[in-house]
């Protein structure tokens, strides 16, 4: 018996009883897309508006404004934003100013003398020093380190584990922006560059793409949501004259977005339907929705069409009436 006990002592393993683990609710920076204390990946093809989208979100977070209409306001937060592609003075700063950001709350780790990588101690030091609630690395390919093969799971896994622990320790959201590969026929989970361990470590994966039938319209669509019901896609416009504009919910899946099979024709059908039924004046919302269902128009598509047309909704005698804009 003594021999067995001695053997057990020599091979002692530190164990944690689940009985000692407190139950905590997931906290969110932007529900249901960006959880706090976790890794989120935002990916898309070059030129699809990933950086512009993130800077718009940063502007709202640093000023405490709702990110989009209907999102709850919050206290202004500090952000760490690292870019390996764009100039700070001629690109990032002007975009932040245009978006209305509080630039005093946006910090950049000075890596002029030494390139920043995922296993760099300066990353944790900066989070601790600033109390940042959001850390952005844009793009992730620029921060894995020259000696790391991003296609090898055994090299990527410890890096992702480390930053996941950083996010958990400091309760901040770490957002990794990445380009996608050119395998257009693959599922969304296999279109991110490098090892699948990137996406495996993330609790939320978002994809940005453009709508084929509308060159100014982009959509951010959830590809993975481990901590909340998968939210619907949200659209935004990058207009040469008006700049960035949120365009509301959009009825499309991530695989449809990546394959280019836009639902633009269904949206146009829904728009034509609304124009026809409302041509003679306002009608009750319930009546319109029932007629749309009979016509095979999905609720999300009807909602998108209503938003695009600017259909108004007015409550009269305990019912909502829809009407075309004057």
Regions picked out by a protein language model, each given a short descriptive name:
Residues 6-10, 18, 24-25, 29-30, ...:
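Conserved inter-motif catalytic segment of the P-loop NTP-binding fold
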Residues 2-14, 46, 128-131, 169-170, ...:
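C-terminal regions of RecA-like/P-loop NTPase motor modules
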Residues 36-40, 77:
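Pre-Walker A (Motif I) flank of P-loop NTPase domains
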Residues 53, 57:
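Hydrophobic positions on the alpha1 helix immediately C-terminal to the Walker A/P-loop
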Residues 41, 47, 52, 82, ...:
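Phosphate-binding/switch region of NTP-binding enzymes
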Residues 62, 164, 168, 293:
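Anion (oxyanion) recognition and catalysis
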């Amino acid at each position: 018996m003594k021999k067995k006990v001695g053997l057990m002592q020599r091979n002692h393993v530190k164990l944690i009883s689940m009985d000692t683990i407190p139950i905590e609710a997931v906290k969110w920076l932007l529900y249901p897309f960006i959880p706090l204390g976790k890794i989120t990946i935002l990916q898309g093809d070059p030129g699809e508006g990933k950086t512009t989208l993130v800077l718009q979100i940063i502007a709202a977070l640093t000023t405490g404004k709702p990110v989009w209409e209907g999102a709850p306001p919050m206290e202004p937060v500090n952000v760490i934003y690292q870019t390996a592609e764009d100039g700070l003075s001629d690109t990032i700063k002007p975009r932040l100013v245009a978006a209305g950001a509080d630039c005093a709350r946006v910090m950049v780790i000075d890596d002029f003398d030494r390139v920043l990588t995922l296993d760099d101690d300066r990353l944790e030091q900066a989070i601790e020093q600033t109390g940042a609630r959001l850390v952005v690395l844009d793009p992730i390919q620029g921060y894995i380190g020259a000696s790391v093969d991003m296609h090898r799971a055994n090299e990527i896994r410890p890096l992702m584990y480390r930053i996941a622990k950083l996010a958990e320790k400091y309760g901040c959201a770490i957002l990794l922006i990445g380009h996608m590969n050119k395998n257009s026929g693959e599922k969304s989970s296999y279109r991110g560059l490098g090892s699948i361990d990137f996406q495996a470590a993330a609790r939320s994966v978002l994809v940005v793409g453009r709508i084929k039938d509308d060159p100014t319209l982009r959509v951010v669509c959830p590809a993975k949501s481990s901590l909340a019901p998968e939210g619907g896609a949200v659209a935004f416009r990058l207009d040469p004259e008006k700049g960035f504009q949120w365009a509301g919910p959009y009825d499309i899946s991530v695989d449809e977005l990546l394959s280019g099979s836009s639902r633009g024709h269904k949206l146009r059908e829904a728009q034509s339907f609304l124009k026809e039924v409302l041509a003679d004046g306002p009608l009750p919302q319930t009546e319109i929705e029932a007629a749309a269902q009979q016509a095979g128009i999905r609720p999300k598509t009807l909602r998108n069409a209503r938003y695009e047309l600017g259909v108004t909704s007015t409550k009269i005698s305990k019912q909502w009436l829809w009407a075309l804009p004057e």
